[in-house]
Swiss-Prot record:
Protein name: Ferrochelatase
Lineage summary: Bacteria, Bacillati, Cyanobacteriota, Cyanophyceae, Synechococcales
Phenotype caused by lack of the gene: Increased light tolerance in a strain missing photosystem I (PSI); may decrease chlorophyll synthesis. This mutant has an insertion between the ferrochelatase and Hli domain which is expected to allow ferrochelatase to be functional. In a quintuple hliA-hliB-hliC-hliD-hemH deletion chlorophyll half-life decreases 2-fold while the half-life of PSII proteins does not change; photosystem II assembly intermediate RC47(1) (PSII monomer without CP43) is missing. De novo chlorophyll synthesis is very slow.
Molecular-function GO terms, alphabetical: ferrochelatase activity; metal ion binding
PROSITE patterns for the chain: FERROCHELATASE (PS00534)
Compartments (UniProt record): Cytoplasm
InterPro entries reported for this sequence: Ferrochelatase, Ferrochelatase_AS, Ferrochelatase_C, Ferrochelatase_N
Keyword Lyase: yes
Amino acid sequence: MGRVGVLLLNLGGPEKLEDVRPFLFNLFADPEIIRLPFPWLQKPLAWLISTLRAKKSQANYAEIGGGSPLLQITEAQASALTTRLERLGQDAKVYIGMRYWHPFTEEAVEKIKGDRLQRLVILPLYPHFSISTSGSSFRVLEEMWHNDPSLRQLDYSLIPSWYDHPGYLQAMADLIAQELKKFPNPDQAHIFFSAHGVPQSYVDEAGDPYQAEIEACTRLIMRTLDRPNQYTLAYQSRVGPVEWLKPYTEEALQKLGAEGIDDLLVVPISFVSEHIETLQEIDIEYREIAEEAGIDNFQRVPALNTHPVFIDALAQMVMDSLNDPPCTFETVPHPKKNMKMYPQERWEWGLTTAAEVWNGRLAMLGFIALLVELISGQGPLHFVGLL
């Protein structure tokens, strides 16, 4: 079979507060996040947005210890996966490629090229496929493969999604069952699945399978759990004025509180690692919303991280991928060329569609004013000492 590698893909996150601003710059410099009519404006606008948003985002990260634990957890997952593959008789080197922070996907690919692999399995750490997560990373890799003849010699295969893998479902069910034991009446606790949202247009216009996979996954987890608990699925992290997948997590929590639900177990279904959306958004923001709605006992299932059943599932996916016909970049969904994309981070873009348009116009005017001040050396930012 030759030398085998596994490339784990994820979003990435700032490891310390000083990383937040450049992380945001990378996020908004991605043309899949903000599409402009003039490409040369992409990076200047990303600089402006990241500068304006850095302080608020830093405050959120400060609430969870000053940075994202995502890389540390992903490294632990990679190490555990390497060990599990060895036990299965498969010698493989595991690489980590993050979309918007170190180690970048490009860095991982350079290491892969240097190691002269014969086989590569590309495994996103997103159970459910979306054009904005796995799809975004796949598009970066596809462009690299297109531009580099040496990469085209590498025998590779993608694992687009794995929301229905029995090992993953069992690991999720095990975690839920453990947390249910903490409630006075475990079978009466309401199970609340919170998935990361995407704009409704991704599903309606681009054919993104994300919503269908999330809904199917929720049903499969409940079937695997085999408990009588009632459950709800909602979508978190909505940004901007456009409609996202519904119901929204905050509204669903308020509705359950009004219905008299006291015991609630939140399951972060989109996330296999602890990061800002679990530690800050769910544990702090949504907990506060739930308590204000009258939900007295708010608990959360931990992310999978290095749960042994989960790691076993990842290893089995890799082994199956090595033995099955390859899945290539051409086989996964691609967004339309003119489709507007939104980041997988939470930023306020405006209250209405008209407000979003005006926000963009004002941002452009602000950017032009900034250029004038930088060239002239005079202006309000110089006066207050910011430049």
